[in-house]
Every structure is written in structure tokens, then in C-alpha cells.
Amino acid sequence: MSTNGNGNKNGEVLKKGADETSVEGLGGNVSGAGPSPESEPGSVTAGKAAPPPGKLTKADFSSDQEVRWCPGCGDYAILNSIQKVMPDLGIPREKIVFVSGIGCSSRFPYYMNTYGFHTIHGRAPAVATGIKASNPELSVWVVTGDGDGLSIGGNHFMHALRRNLDLNIILFNNRIYGLTKGQYSPTSEFGKKTKSTPMGVIDYPVTPLSLAIASEATFVARSIDIDVKHLSSIVEAAAHHKGVSFVEVYQNCNIFNDGAFESFTERSVRPDRVLYLEHGKPMVFGKNRDRGIRMNGTRPEVIQLGSETGLNESDCLVHDVHIEDPSVAFMLARMEQPEFPQPVGIFRDVRRATYEDLLAHQIEESVARTGRGDLHKLIHSGDMWVVE
């Protein structure tokens, strides 16, 4: 549906025929049989020829590119989940754009048979903002990582959230720099020893959900790479949200930070150490659903349910994703193992006018008031001079 790799250094969308990718005026190999996606940033990705009209499938969203993540990487599970969800959204592939920055996660657009931009470090939200503002009918997805999105890209990340463009931002959090081989990232734990911190990290880590909520994101959620059913449901909910959606995915880097989340994501302990948030339901967890969360003054606490304590589900805090005040969502985002179960699910889902709708309204108002502008007339008006 657009470029696959080398040759397009200008970020230009390439035209695709029935059987191959072609481009006018650009050099380099841009055919489907070209090099693997070790391309320069700024390129746009290409996939297969469009299928005949009809119901799309997961295969229709899989490009012809070899997936080049490390064997066992959590990114495979995320890719699989998103490709499964795409057909159910009912959006034509030519109306979908994936935008990435730099990092392992940023190879993502190459593997989606949609339009895509592989941009520069940390700038995916800025490029996505331009795409959505210029073409509001598109479904725009940003794929980033904890390094790309929260370090050099932190400023763009924050402003994309507060503006509330109708973007879907998926952040792969593995608490490490993977592509550059194991340096600490903004989400690495305090004291963690890495190649760039041999004596331990002395930075305090960013909590991505806290940052997203503080930046006024209207949809905030979290899932786990290996919990495919849950992840797929979260991605689908994010896609249906009108406004910016932010999804953090706990993703295992089995080469440079293996087991970063296994203390609570491993299947045998997950029921006791993960709290699955569900709108309108009490916050209950545990293999036997015998523990819950309630408020004790201004703080949450874990309570034991059952006849011994006389407490039951009615004593637990009931989750409400639609509360406009972000205080409870922020509190939940701060809950962490081992004191609390690790919350996953939708933390916040509220409605607010989107940036692109407000922008379109302003443009319509301006045109109605002063008429449609004439660029040629503007350039040739007023004092002018010629440099010879």
C-alpha cells in the first residue's frame, strides 16, 4: 500500500499497482522483492496488492516483509493481536496509517499491509498530528516504545495527548533500550544495572500511564503482550474511541531485559498479582476472587473477602472509566506490585472535542467570514522586491 524500505528518503507516499510497487521520480529499490526493512528513517512502507472487494482477514493486514524481531520477542504477540483486530474495525486499508519513530517497535509499519511512515527518533506523534489534521478521515496509529516515546519523544508525546487528536498511540514498554543493545530507558527501575548504568540507575522511572493521564489523555489503558485476548479487546476499544487513545503494553525483551514483568504476568501467578479492571464492576482479584480493592481515606488498600473478615464484593471500589475527574484513574495508575496487584484494562474513557474537529470548525468560520484565500494574490500583494 506504500513503500517498503529503501529508496524513499523524502517520506513520500509511493503509488502501488496491481502486482508491484512503483514510483515516479525516485530512485532505489522499492519493489516488493526489495531489501528487508533496515531502511533509513523517513521512509514509507509498502505491502501486498489490494485484495478483491469483500471481508478482510488478518492475512490481508500482513505485509510481504519478513518480520525481523528477535525470536521470542513480545512484539510478535502485539503485532498478531493488532492484525487480528484490524478486519473487525471495518476500515479500508487505504484509510489506515501506522506511524513509528526509532527502535525495535518502530519496525511495525513494515509488517502492516497499510500505509505507514517510519519517521525519526521520537517524532512519530508530530508526524501523526500532521497526517490527522490534514486527512481527518484516516485512522492513524502511532507505534512507539518507552525509549522513543518517553525520552527524546516525550515532549511530542505529551502534546499529542493534550491536544486530543483522534490518534491511537500504542507504547511497547520493555523497560530497556533494545535496538541499541541494552541501555537503561526512562521506565527502567531505580537501581537497575544495565550497560549504560553498571552501578545502577539513579533516575526515578516514568510511569507511562501517570504521564498520559496528567497530559489529559481521554482514553488510557494497559495490557500485557502474552495476554492476547485481553490485548485484542483493549486495542479494539482504543480504535473505537473518538479522541486520543493511549495503550501501554508490557512487552518482554527476552534478549536484554528478559522477565521484566514475569513476577506478575507469568500464567501461574497472574490471577493473584494482576487486577483486571472492568467498567461497572467491583475491583476483585485472586485465583479464588477472594481479594479486592477499597478506599481507606485517600488511599487504596487490599482487603480479604470472605466469612472470616465479613467483607464481600460490595465493599470493593467499583470501576468507572467515564469519570471526568482523572484522580481515581491516576491513583490506579500508581498501584504497583508487590503492595498492590498490577492493574490492567481501561483506566479512563471520556469524551471531549477533538483537535481536528475544532480545527475544521475554525477554518469553516474563517472562510465564511472572509472568503476562501488566494495564495497567489497574497504572495503578490503589498510591498514586493526582486532579487537579481
Spans of features found by a protein language model:
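Long, contiguous secondary-structure blocks with strong helical propensity
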Residues: S2, V23-V30, K48, I82-V99, ...
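Flexible, low-complexity linker and terminal segments
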Residues: S2-K55, D64, I255-E388
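Glycine-rich ThDP/TPP pyrophosphate-binding loop and its adjacent helix/strand module
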Residues: I152-G153, H159-L167, F172, I176-S314, ...
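Short coil/turn connectors at secondary-structure junctions
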Residues: Q65, P92-I96, S134-V140, R162-N168, ...
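General structural feature for long, well-ordered alpha-helical segments within catalytic domains
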Residues: E66-W69, G74-S81, E94, G153-H156, ...
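Active-site diphosphate/adenylate-binding microenvironment
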Residues: A59-I120
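Thiamine diphosphate
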Residues: S100-G178
